[in-house]
């Protein structure tokens, strides 16, 4: 599939014949929401562990969503992953950018789930 082109319904049917990928999107949304709950008030060790889990999930979701034609979800997931990685290198920097990227990803997941 050329970069930037969404897959067609026929291509999606070949990739996801039983249509269960949207269930994964919903499950990933729920996990991200749980990881984010009270994240910034959690003890530092717990916060770091949860951010690492969120980063890994964002990476996996970014790749899978792109494969299944959810390009906006893929882009938002990779943006969240990148922001978490940058923050790790900066130490205890402001969290607003991570919160913004997470909100954007959750929004694209909601939109994708409504459309499918």
Segment roles from a protein language model:
Residues 11, 40, 56:
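Residue-level detector of functional hotspots within protein domains
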């Amino acid at each position: 599939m050329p970069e930037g082109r969404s897959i067609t319904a026929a291509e999606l049917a070949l990739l996801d014949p039983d249509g269960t990928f949207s269930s994964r999107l919903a499950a990933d949304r729920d996990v991200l929401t749980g990881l984010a709950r009270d994240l910034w008030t959690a003890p530092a060790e717990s916060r770091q562990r949860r951010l690492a889990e969120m980063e890994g999930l964002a990476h996996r979701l970014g790749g899978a969503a792109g494969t299944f034609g959810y390009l906006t979800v893929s882009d938002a997931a990779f943006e969240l992953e990148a922001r978490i990685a940058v923050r790790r290198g900066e130490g205890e920097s402001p969290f607003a950018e991570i919160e913004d990227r997470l909100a954007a990803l959750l929004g694209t997941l909601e939109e994708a789930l409504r459309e499918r």
